[in-house]
Amino acid sequence: MPENLQLVIITGMSGAGKTVAVQSFEDMGYFCIDNLPPSLIPKFWELIKESGKVTKIALVIDLRSRTFFREIQDMLVELENTNFIDTTILFLDATDEELVSRYKETRRAHPMAMDGLVTEGIRKERAMLEEIKADAQLVIDTTDLSPRQLRERLNKELATRETHEFRVEMVSFGFKYGLPIDADIVMDVRFLPNPHYIDELRPLTGMDQPVYDYVMGFPETDEFYTKFIDLLRTVLPGYKKEGKSSVTIAIGCTGGQHRSVALTERVGAELKEEDYHVNITHRDRLKRKETVNRS
């Protein structure tokens, strides 16, 4: 039996990118099987044991059936006592609006839209997958990711898991554009003074020094920052202890241009100083400029 087997179970919303994920895992040297019923996994495992050659496995499994969900849970308990010592459930998600857009673009029927309404199919599927999403070690929101960006994200995630490195994903966002659906921790900083109402600061972002200094120049900002960092010093070790390879922290303001960007930069810098591996993404930082340019 090969040692250090890595098993990735790929699931998630229809249209969220599972096909791209499978292609990415194949490129990374994984043995991939698409839509294997959970009831056949024990037999598949026996074949893997007999071969002794496969060390990386990725399975795409349809978990819309509650029976399938129970089977996969039982299977994972069994695998905890085997050499599949690194089992990861990867859940791919996207906003309902983005999923509808993708289905319209491809003109495909949603597998759960019995009456032809894509929105109803998405609603049913999301409800059925709620449990497995909660149990997933890795949730990726593909709403704003191109296929190439999804491949890059998966490469990064898998590299982290293989080296057992704990990573913190910092994301700034604007509430007007929706919550990041893969966030583990969401913080609302709309209570802080808004640079948007200062004429010379309005066109800038939280990465520009004048905006950064403005946001950080208030006592309430210092108080919030100190308490939030203290909170993270408590919860991040807990996430790591529970076996998570990464945690996504989302900080939001109204438009995702000023306050959230500045705070995300500051919190990210502090966590780097404390030896966390940190990636920073400003999801909506330039969206206002893009809107102005299109109008």
Swiss-Prot record:
GTP binds at D62, L63, R64, S65. ATP binds at G12, M13, S14, G15, A16, G17, K18, T19. Keywords: ATP-binding, GTP-binding, Nucleotide-binding. Pfam families: PapZ_C, RapZ-like_N. GO terms for molecular function: ATP binding; GTP binding. Displays ATPase and GTPase activities. Belongs to the RapZ-like family. This is Nucleotide-binding protein EF_0766. It comes from Enterococcus faecalis (strain ATCC 700802 / V583).
